[in-house]
């Protein structure tokens, strides 16, 4: 369910998220062992624009299944409540 919701809201996330939120999400997801250090480095270092980082991050998380997506949504609500609200995640 959570993975389907994120897929539907993918475009809003990509176009609206800021660099600070992406970095905070990466830290939280690494701490929760949703992503690996390698995944984190891939998002941060292999993408030039914030939109590219956002695209890779949301695709990475949705590919890991509903539990990972729930953790992503929880952290997004904490780190950027405005964006979470815009995405209809509250």
Curated annotation (Swiss-Prot):
GO terms for molecular function: CARD domain binding; caspase binding; cysteine-type endopeptidase activity; cysteine-type endopeptidase inhibitor activity. CDD domains: CARD_CASP1-like. Induction: Up-regulated in response to TNF and bacterial lipopolysaccharides (LPS). GO terms for biological process: inflammatory response; negative regulation of interleukin-1 beta production; negative regulation of protein binding; proteolysis; regulation of apoptotic process. SUPFAM superfamilies: DEATH domain. Gene3D superfamilies: Death Domain, Fas (1.10.533.10). One of its GO terms (cellular component) is protein-containing complex. This is Caspase recruitment domain-containing protein 18. The lineage of its organism: Eukaryota, Metazoa, Chordata, Craniata, Vertebrata. The gene is CARD18.
